[in-house]
Structures are given as C-alpha cells and as structure tokens.
Amino acid sequence: MTAPRSVDPRPRPFQLAACAEMLWPDRPIEWRAARLTEMGLGVGLWNWDSHDLDKLAGVGARYTIMNGYLRGRLADAEGAAMLLASAGEAIEVGKRLGVARLNLHGTGLGDHGIPLSRHEVVSGAMWLQARDTLNRICDLAEREGVVFTLENLNQRDHPGCPFASTGDVLALVSSIDRPQLRVNLDLYHTQIGEGDLIRWCERCLPWIGEIQVADNPGRFEPGTGEIGFAAIATALVRMGYDGPVGMEAFAQGDSDAAVAAFVSAFTPAPAVSVA
C-alpha cells in the first residue's frame, strides 16, 4: 500500500467516514477499508454478503454503517417477515465487524438502485404496515443492542421507491420515536428531491443517526457540484450536531483527493472572535 495522502490536521467537529464501496474501484474492499482507516476515517459498507468478512474484520477499521438487510420490504406483511429475518442476519454480521448502524430503505434495491418493488402511490394501509414493521425492527434492535437507520432516496435515481422522500423518512422515524431507529439523512438525495438542505437538517436533527453527503450533479465528492457544503458544515456546528457525517460518493478523479476534499469541507475553520 502506498503512503496515504496527508489529511487535514485541523480538529474535526464531526465523526467522519466514507463509503468504501465507491472509492478505489480497482482495489479489494479490505484494502479500501484499510486506506480509509489510515486516513483517520470510519468505513461505510453496502451489501456485506459479497465480501470476505474475515478479511474485513482483520483490518481493524471503524465500520460506521452497512446495509441492515438483504431482502424484504416495509409495507406488506410478507415483505416485513422477510425484512425481519434478513435484519437478524445483518445484526450478526454487524456485531462481528463492530458496525455502528444498520441501514434500511423503503424497499429492497436491485441493479443500479432500482427498487425491487415499485409503487407510484403509497396507500394509508402501506403507511400503517411500514410503521408496524419498523416498530418490530426496533423491538429486535432493542433486544440485540443495535441501532438501525432509515435512509431517504430520490425518485430520479430510485423511481417508485416507497417512503423515499426526506419528509416520509422523518415522518416514520419521528412518529415511532425510539432510539433504535434513526434517520440516515442523505443530503445528495435531499438536494435532488427537495432542496432546502439546512432546514431539513434542522427538522431532522433530533432523530439523525448519520448524515451522508455527495455533490450534485454526478454524485461525486464535495466541491464538484452545486451544493454549498461549507455552509452546511457551519450550520451543523451551530445546531450543535457533532455526530457521524459519511461521504457516500464516487471520486470524480483520484480517490485520495476526493477523501481530502470531503474532510476539508467538513472541517470548518474555527470562529474568530471580534473584540
């Protein structure tokens, strides 16, 4: 492994991490996890069943989040049973790797993020079933001592995904209001779906388990698109948020440079007092 690019030495107000699945695509996943660890970041994963868990465990990485299921859906009884069984498997893997949070979506995602079960209209009955399913997830999480998150998505990249909007995710998580279920606030998806990012951070703040970021358009690292991440980082500090911020983005060019850009964007300069 070559020496890692130097990282920003300033104190970091957030718990920074990056998704290993999207960086250094020509390298094995355990190499990517080790690289992020060397750079002082936590490591996010997607579907754990495609990786060698022994190698990942041997890295000594701080794994921050991974998919909390491989099968299942929120909004129907059959899908809920599948989801709960799959979540149980994910919990065992998460404990083995020491993963902090297990992530859920409104339904399973297939190739290129296309929902396996698409719904143009979400009925009241589906809302009630989703809330019941998530409460059962919380019961499981409480027994096992783990935390799940529910992530918002955008309908352009994930057409027909139920409970995908930022508002839908916040409504479900806040109405359940249990510590075993938090919001995974993905600002890339919020920017496409709703915009108004700082206000959404404020609304979601009491229930945020993690904030994920990528710039838009392109889903590359901060600084490659239209989102003002420096302003968002400053606003989060002002709100008192000091929790996890994960880059779930592709590198527009060099992956080391992408990580450095992310760290810089979420390491705000200290405030200067004026006499």
Report residues per predicted region.
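Active-site acidic/histidine proton-transfer and metal-coordination neighborhood
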Residues: 3-10, 76-182, 192, 272-274
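Residue-level detector of anion-binding/catalytic polar loops
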Residues: 42, 62, 100, 147, ...
